[in-house]
């Protein structure tokens, strides 16, 4: 094998190695950024779903005069949304979901991210005004507080 052929083969091999290392470098820089974007989108989906549950709880309170009881509260809310004529007719516009999610009373109380855990709901109906707390078990996000009336319908992420 003469020197010209050997140099040509080495040049081709080194070119392929440079392209492979360049691709690896690109992926090592953009990969973590893409994961951050995916995590942010999931967080926004969960928060939007929690805001929809808050809106449903406030609608329930407006119609019934109080919040659902603590025991079976979210199930009571789902049953109410399935039977209320306004919620049936306009539920998708009343409780807006972040695409690609769609409104469904059954899935409203579940986190949109796998493993689809139920939101935690607690109510303190002995205080005036009655207070509720809605919490995502997979994060620190919550809406409202059981002890402070100043956090009326406030979310923890704002």
Description of each model-found segment:
Residues 1-12:
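N-terminal positive-inside, membrane-proximal cytosolic segments immediately preceding the first
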Residues 31-46:
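Aliphatic-rich helix starts adjacent to a transmembrane/signal segment
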